[in-house]
Swiss-Prot record:
Gene that specifies this protein: ins-17
InterPro entries: Insulin-like_sf (IPR036438), Insulin_CS (IPR022353)
Main localization (coarse): secreted
UniProt note on tissues of expression: Expressed in head neurons and the uterus.
Gene Ontology biological process terms in this record: dauer larval development
Keywords: Secreted, Signal
GO cellular component: extracellular region
Protein name: Insulin-like peptide 17
Protein task: Involved in the regulation of the larval diapause.
Keyword Transferase: no
Length: 108
């Protein structure tokens, strides 16, 4: 009925199809699916937090600051230092110029 050669050919074909994932389906996306936060369009992802890329951006952006803003007006949620939170946010989700402006010259 079936020859050994035919069975081997059928098994090798099934193994090749399974290896390329042709029978697999992607997992359905539900409301409970955890997605990593996406970077905002036009934002800078500066990783690692506090690394050379963040320091370079900080040194380039802060001299461009035009108006003074109180740091406590915008960022007063009490969860650690503003600089540390900004560095982590810039690495995880990306940050814009205005996010870094808020930490420029906090004493001036």
């Amino acid at each position: 009925m079936f020859s050994t050669r035919g069975v081997l050919l059928l098994l090798s074909l099934m193994a090749a199809v399974a290896a390329f994932g042709l029978f697999s389906r992607p997992a359905p996306i539900t409301r409970d699916t955890i997605r990593p936060p996406r970077a905002k369009h036009g934002s800078l992802k500066l990783c690692p937090p506090g690394g050379a890329s963040f320091l370079d951006a900080f040194n380039l952006i802060c001299p461009m600051r035009r108006r003074r803003r109180s740091v406590s007006e915008n960022y007063n949620d009490g969860g650690g230092s503003l600089l540390g939170r900004t560095m982590n946010m810039c690495c995880e989700t990306g940050c814009e110029f205005t996010d870094i402006f808020a930490i420029c010259n906090p004493f001036g």
